[in-house]
Structure formats: C-alpha cells, structure tokens
Amino acid sequence: MAAANPWDPASSQTAAGLLLNHLVASGIVTKEMLDVSKKMAPCFVNFSRLQQISDIQAEIYQNNLELELLKLEKDTADLIHPSHLIEKCDVLQSMNNHLEAVLKEKHAIRQRLLRPMCQENLPLEAVYHRYVVHMLDLAVTFIEKFETHLETVKNSPHLDANLKQMSKALAKMDILVNKTEELAENILKWRELQTEISLYIPKMLTEERHLHELDIVPPLPFFPKAHTETSRAK
C-alpha cells in the first residue's frame, strides 16, 4: 500500500478523522451514527422555524379575534334588527302619548290626589275579589311579622358578634354540664357512703353494747375508706 502524500491536502487526515476511524474500528460508534450527525440541520434553520411558529401563532390570534367579533355581531344582530327597532319605537310612541295625556290632565289628577280617599268604594270586578282576599291575608301576615323582620335587618350587621357570643355561651354550657355530671357522681358516691354508714351504725352499737356488758373497752369506731377520704376532702 502506497504511503499517503503529506503534501496533498486531499490525502491528509486530521486528528479528528483519525480519532473517528479508531472509534469505528473499535466498534464504539457506527457509520450510521456518524451519517446521522452529519445530516443535522444548522441552528439557523431552527431560528427560521421559530419565526414560522411565531407567525402562525399571530395568525391564530388574529383569527380568534375575528371569530369573537363575528360572534358578538351575531348576538347583537337581533337587537338592531328592523323588526325589534319598530317594536321599540311603538313602545316609545305609546309612552309618549301617555305622558302627553297625563300632562293634559295634570290639574285634574292633582285635584284627585289631594282629595281624601276615605270611605270611598273602589270599583273592582268580581273576578278579582278572591285575589283581593288573598292579598289581604298576605298583608296581615306581613304586618304581624314586620317588627320581627325589622329586628332581623337591624341585627344583621351584628351577626358575627352574636355568633361569637353564642359560641362562648355554648362553651360555658359545656363546662356547666361537665361540672353537673361531676356533682351528680359525687352525690351518688355520697349516697352510697351514707347507706354504708347507716348499715354499719346499728352493728357498731350492738357490738358496743355487748362489750359494755362484758366490761371491755370498745375499740375506736371503724369508718370505711371512702368515708375517710371524703372527710379529708371536706
């Protein structure tokens, strides 16, 4: 095999080339891996792709804005439709006519309002009599509960304070309940102790009488342990 000409740049190999040949010969890397690494796109291609993505996102945002405008136009199309505008104009015209009639009869209406309405029967059709009765029942119920409603409205700003007071009262009630339970247990124990003492006294008197008859000094009276602990506690 002829030696490579060191003066020929085409036949000379660099250190990187020699290293890659050594890696391929040793099996650490393959030619396919080297080919894939050669085909990687340069960084400028990624910049161009990023610019394309930004342009596409801007276009999507613009399309979304146009879509929202179309939806808004569709929703408001019924309001500005000629038929709806005609109805509104008719309502305004009828209101205007009513106001003109009120202004024409202003003096008569004022005199009627100044005149008292006591002891006068208002004309009411028979069809609406039952509704009037029901309305009167509702009015009576409302008047009866009116003061309660007023108190509720007045106390509504102080609702938090009332809740705190209620919580404190409940806590105190729990403490009192616990103390009452302890007191009840102590009373039951005291009753049991009194029962034991009442049963023991006749027996003690009998023994004392018997010892007295035999001229023997009686021992000190025996009290149960529970009675001694209760006396010390007192």
UniProtKB/Swiss-Prot annotation:
One of its GO terms (biological process) is centrosome cycle. Pfam families: HAUS2. Keywords: Cell cycle, Cell division, Coiled coil, Cytoplasm, Cytoskeleton, Microtubule, Mitosis. Signal peptide: none annotated. Its main location: cytoplasm. Residues 85-105, 162-182 form a coiled coil. Contributes to mitotic spindle assembly, maintenance of centrosome integrity and completion of cytokinesis as part of the HAUS augmin-like complex. Belongs to the HAUS2 family. This is HAUS augmin-like complex subunit 2. It comes from Mus musculus.
